[in-house]
Amino acid sequence: MSKVTFKVTLTSDPRLPYKVLSVPEGTPFTAVLKFAAEEFKVPAATSAIITNDGIGINPAQTAGNVFLKHGSDLRLIPRDRVGSS
């Protein structure tokens, strides 16, 4: 099985740190989201991954599908601050 590579940028940090992750294309994208969140030390349960265009990605698909639909450049958003007042 071939691998796909994602560059995931943490948008909540002003320095915009990023991690490059390579995973088998059959990997559930929920696992990619969880691993990326753990790498940035943010809670996976309240995080989302979006494209650079701001389009949300449904994690209920394989990493290969996400790569084909959205490419390799993604952003991780911790949702704990979204919508709070």
Swiss-Prot record:
There is a cross-link at residue 69 (Glycyl lysine isopeptide (Lys-Gly) (interchain with G-Cter in UFM1)). GO terms for cellular component: cytoplasm; nucleus. One of its GO terms (biological process) is protein ufmylation. Residues 84-85 form a propeptide. UFM1 precursor is cleaved by UFSP1, promoting its maturation: processing of the C-terminal Ser-Cys dipeptide is required to expose its C-terminal conserved Gly residue. There is a cross-link at residue 83 (Glycyl lysine isopeptide (Gly-Lys) (interchain with K-? in acceptor proteins)). It comes from the Eukaryota. Keywords: Cytoplasm, Isopeptide bond, Nucleus, Ubl conjugation, Ubl conjugation pathway. Interacts with UBA5. Interacts with UFC1. Belongs to the UFM1 family. Ubiquitin-like modifier which can be covalently attached via an isopeptide bond to lysine residues of substrate proteins as a monomer or a lysine-linked polymer. The so-called ufmylation, requires the UFM1-activating E1 enzyme UBA5, the UFM1-conjugating E2 enzyme UFC1, and the UFM1-ligase E3 enzyme UFL1. Ufmylation is involved in various processes, such as ribosome recycling, response to DNA damage, transcription or reticulophagy (also called ER-phagy) induced in response to endoplasmic reticulum stress. This is Ubiquitin-fold modifier 1. It comes from Columba livia (Rock dove). The gene is UFM1.
